[in-house]
Design a protein with these regions (language model features):
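Short beta-strand/loop motif that positions the catalytic acidic residue
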Residues: 233, 239-241
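Catalytic active-site module of serine/aspartate enzymes centered on a nucleophile-bearing elbow/loop
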Residues: 280-322
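Catalytic histidine neighborhood in serine/cysteine hydrolases
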Residues: 260-275
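Hydrolase active-site cap/lid region
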Residues: 163-219, 228
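The serine-hydrolase catalytic nucleophile loop
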Residues: 86-98
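Alpha/beta-hydrolase active-site loop
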Residues: 124-144
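An N-terminal hydrophobic leader/cap segment in hydrolases
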Residues: 1-53
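Conserved alpha/beta-hydrolase
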Residues: 100-119
Length: 384
């Protein structure tokens, strides 16, 4: 019996430190990135792949998407740097490609060290990654025709945004989806929910985990507190969090939002969990946010009072049926606009993005939407 308890404790301990710095790796091939040359909305785009040396000396695999010179709407174009989650890769950012490109913005995606096809064994949930962002931003700035830069991160990538942005005035705006505020708080939550250790053992387990991670990765998890950077960060920002996030509780975004130092900030909450595909209306709002601040360069106070800019939007208040109807109507409108602006032969050559390339390749919400749609169809048939 005693041996079983020891074995259980050992498994719990290993599960926790691996959850922090060695989660399941996203394995893919270069073919999964799609064609290096493609047509989208009557423009020809190219994907260029780069190898950059990280702050710790690891090769980071990166990709940059931009229109060919004859198709550039402007000589200088802004760039969004997308930062992926802890067990994800640059494929996650490619899932946002359409929304970014149609806003006349270029996209740069990266596999952080320890992720995807990049070198390295461990991640650091934003600590080392924040120094890697500087390496990437320095590189992006040297690409001919590059304008302002925005950051878009999810989970680990969102925490990285928060840690880094205040250090660099070149970052003009940021979007953070599912960030954590304080890793000490998060670690205790993970121990209680996922590892399920007794309360008396939590403190001791975290101390052992801290020393293990410090030895393996040089990361002191007690210093991993994005919330310390929040008051110092001034760029316009959007926070996004699912209300049923089982990995990072949505209260972490509440905490960050409350102390965020920028005058223009918005918190969007939606139905779903950590890896649920975000509603299309949120993705569109993010796209418009980047367009306003990177392309139109709207000033913080233009056409808005501070009261209007500092809002929390609980997008889960309406019924799910109403939301799905709204999304379908908006998607149909977008489709009609695209059909008017594109030739049929060009549409056949448009970039084909794998459905699995949307946030962490998980679409848990699709089944729920289909069920509701089937119910509505049955009601319509009965009425007829």
């Amino acid at each position: 019996m005693e041996n079983k308890e020891k074995e259980k404790s050992k498994m719990s301990y290993e599960s926790l430190w691996k959850l922090v710095i060695r989660p399941e790796r996203d394995n893919y091939t270069i073919k999964d990135l799609g064609n290096p040359k493609f047509t989208f909305l009557s423009r020809t785009y190219t994907r260029k792949d780069y190898d950059l040396l990280s702050s710790e000396g690891y090769i980071m695999k990166c990709s940059f998407f931009e229109p060919e010179i004859p198709f550039r709407p402007k000589k200088t174009m802004p760039v969004i740097l997308y930062l992926h989650g802890n067990s994800s890769s640059r494929l996650e950012g490619i899932g946002m490609l359409r929304e970014v490109l149609k806003r006349d913005i270029n996209l740069f995606v990266v596999d952080f060290p320890g992720s995807g096809l990049s070198e390295g064994e461990y991640i650091s949930l934003g600590y080392h990654e924040s120094y890697d962002v500087k390496v990437i931003v320095d590189f992006i700035e040297k690409i001919p025709g590059t304008g302002d830069i925005g950051l878009w991160g999810r989970s680990m990538g969102a925490a990285t945004c928060m840690i880094y942005a205040h250090r660099d005035e070149r970052i003009k705006c940021i979007v953070m989806d599912s960030p954590f505020a304080d890793f000490n708080v998060l670690a205790k939550e993970l121990v209680l929910k996922q590892i399920k250790l007794p309360n008396l053992l939590i403190g001791g387990a975290l101390k052992i985990v801290r020393m293990t991670i410090l030895k393996k990765n040089g990361l002191d998890i007690e210093k991993l507190k994005p919330i310390d950077s929040a008051p110092k960060t001034k760029q316009p920002a959007i926070f996004i969090h699912a209300v049923s996030d089982e990995l990072i509780n949505n209260k972490h975004s509440d905490m960050l939002f409350a102390v965020y130092g920028g005058k223009e900030k918005k918190l969007l909450k939606c139905i779903g969990n950590h890896n649920t595909r975000r509603p299309s209306r949120i993705i569109r709002e993010v796209g418009q946010f980047f367009y306003d601040h990177l392309v139109n360069k709207v000033q913080n106070n233009n056409n808005k009072s501070n009261e209007e800019a500092n809002n929390i939007f609980n997008l889960d208040l309406n019924s799910e049926e109403d939301k799905i109807k709204e999304e379908k109507e908006n998607e149909n409108q977008d489709l009609n606009k695209n059909n008017e602006n594109s030739q049929n032969n060009e549409e056949k050559n448009e970039i084909k993005l794998n459905n699995n390339q949307i946030i962490d390749h998980k679409e848990e919400s699709i089944n729920n939407e289909q069920k509701i749609e089937n119910k509505e169809n049955k009601k319509d048939n009965n009425n007829q």
